[in-house]
């Protein structure tokens, strides 16, 4: 999208940031008027979560915050599919990967405390 002059005579780059005084984003400009000179306020503009960055009173821009990369699989399932099971052992036979734990010694019970 090209740059178009906004109401303040500045240029609105709608692909990277949202100028709140631009006619395209005018419904959100009311939020900017309420916020005033806030440094960073969470906001949602056209479904994009961002921060209102306001170094001065005007203009106020919203810079979209990057979202984490989405994986088609649920977390943890990628490890299951990345490491296929080893079928060298017959079913029902376990092969422990760690040495067995030492036996626990039961301590005698102490008398009731008074």
Swiss-Prot record:
Residues 95-104 are annotated as: Interaction with host SRC, HCK, FYN, PIK3R3 and GRB2. The PSAP motif is necessary for the release of membrane-wrapped virions from infected cells. A motif (PTAP/PSAP motif) lies at residues 96-99. Residues 48-72 are annotated as: Interaction with the capsid protein. It holds the Pfam family HEV_ORF1. This is Protein ORF3. It is found in: Host endoplasmic reticulum membrane; Host cytoplasm, Host cytoskeleton; Virion; Host cell membrane. Forms homooligomers. Interacts with host SRC, HCK, FYN, PIK3R3 and GRB2 (via SH3 domain); binding does not activate the kinases. Interacts with host AMBP/bikunin and AMBP/alpha-1-microglobulin peptides. Interacts with host HPX/hemopexin. Interacts (when phosphorylated) with capsid protein ORF2. Interacts with host TSG101; this interaction plays a role in viral release from the host cell. Interacts with host SIRPA; this interaction down-regulates the phosphorylation of host IRF3. Residues 6-22, 33-53 are annotated as: Hydrophobic. The modification Phosphoserine is found at residue 71.
């Amino acid at each position: 999208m090209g740059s178009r002059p906004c109401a303040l005579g500045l240029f609105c780059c709608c692909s990277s940031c949202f100028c709140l005084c631009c006619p395209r984003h005018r419904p959100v400009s009311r939020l900017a008027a309420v916020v005033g000179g806030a440094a960073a306020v969470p906001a949602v503009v056209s479904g994009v979560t961002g921060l209102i960055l306001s170094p001065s009173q005007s203009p106020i821009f919203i810079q979209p915050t990057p979202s984490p990369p989405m994986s088609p699989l649920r977390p943890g399932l990628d490890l299951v599919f990345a490491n296929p099971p080893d079928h060298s052992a017959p079913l029902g036979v376990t092969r422990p990967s760690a040495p067995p734990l030492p036996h626990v010694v039961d301590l005698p019970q102490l008398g009731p405390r008074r």
